Design a protein with these regions (language model features):
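An N-terminal RHG(E/S)-centered segment typical of histidine phosphatases
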Residues: 1-46, 53-55, 61, 65, ...
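Beta-strand elements within well-structured catalytic alpha/beta cores of enzymes
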Residues: 2-6, 49, 157-166, 170
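Short active-site segment of divalent metal-dependent hydrolases/proteases
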Residues: 11, 170-171
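Glycine-rich, phosphate-binding/catalytic loops in enzymes
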Residues: 21-23, 64-67, 91, 180-183
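Phosphate-coordination/substrate-recognition cap region in phosphate-metabolizing enzymes
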Residues: 37-111
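Acidic, low-complexity terminal tails and accessory targeting/binding regions
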Residues: 81-95, 146-161, 176-231
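Short glycine/proline- and acidic residue-enriched helix-loop micro-motifs
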Residues: 101-127
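Hydrophobic, aromatic-enriched interface-forming segments
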Residues: 117-163, 171
Length: 231
């Protein structure tokens, strides 16, 4: 089984120097999404899951137009992280936004872990994983052991491939889950995906189950112009 993780296209975070809540895509974001979708043929994806936030929903549009997926599902639990401090940023200027994140990103690991954002991330991740496991179980994909690595039972009639269009924070939880890696409040910065880049996980059979390995990370080779490759 293969899982394709895609981050949304470039969002229009700032309009008239005001930070936007639930922004749509920039013109470049639409270009990135179109080029990303062109890499997949009609009905090459069994199921596509997508976040309902505008930037993800608009990234989905060319995938829908090209009929990439046989089935599309929108899930609330795929939304991006948004703690109370981040919510308070909406409507503020670019200078205020930069100042906020510079301060947050300069914390020690110890400070970050016990901060309001660090505690929020624990609940954020738990919600994603609980819902993810529920949906995977419906497809015949169940984690049966994690003593050494996450070992999955994958039914023969389960999907051959799954695509998930979401966000950097959401993707950090998904990657940490499938690859059985520690998840921290800053994990999304360790594995920061480019806009509309392709990250692929492929299951590998062992004697008594399967585990997922990272086959491809952050592939944006389909965006030829380096200036169009953004984070």
């Amino acid at each position: 089984m293969e899982i394709v993780l895609i981050r949304h296209g470039q969002p229009e975070w700032m309009i008239n120097d005001e930070y936007q809540k639930n922004p749509g895509l920039t013109e470049l974001g639409y270009i990135q999404s179109t080029k990303s979708a062109r890499q997949f043929t009609k009905h090459s994806i069994d199921q596509l899951w997508v976040s309902p936030l505008n930037r993800a929903a608009q990234t989905l549009t060319p995938f829908e137009t090209n009929e990439v997926a046989k089935e599309i599902k929108t899930f609330e639990w795929l939304k991006e992280m948004e703690d109370k401090d981040e919510v308070a940023l909406y409507g503020k200027s670019s200078d205020e936004i930069m100042s906020f994140f510079e301060k947050r990103n300069s914390q020690t690991f110890e400070e970050w872990a016990v901060s309001s954002h660090g505690l929020y991330m624990q609940d954020f991740a738990k919600n994603i994983i609980t819902n993810l496991e529920g949906e995977l179980e419906k497809l015949g994909i169940v984690c049966i052991d994690d003593t050494f690595d996450k070992k999955f039972e994958i039914r023969n009639d389960s999907l051959e491939n799954l695509m998930i269009i979401s966000h950097a924070g959401t993707m950090s939880v998904l990657l940490s889950y499938f690859l059985n890696m520690p998840l921290y409040a800053w994990t999304w910065k360790k594995f920061l995906p480019r806009h509309t880049g392709h990250t692929r996980l492929r299951s590998m059979a062992i004697s008594d189950g399967h585990f997922f390995r990272l086959k491809e990370f952050n592939n944006v080779s389909f965006i030829e112009n380096p200036e169009e490759q953004t984070y």
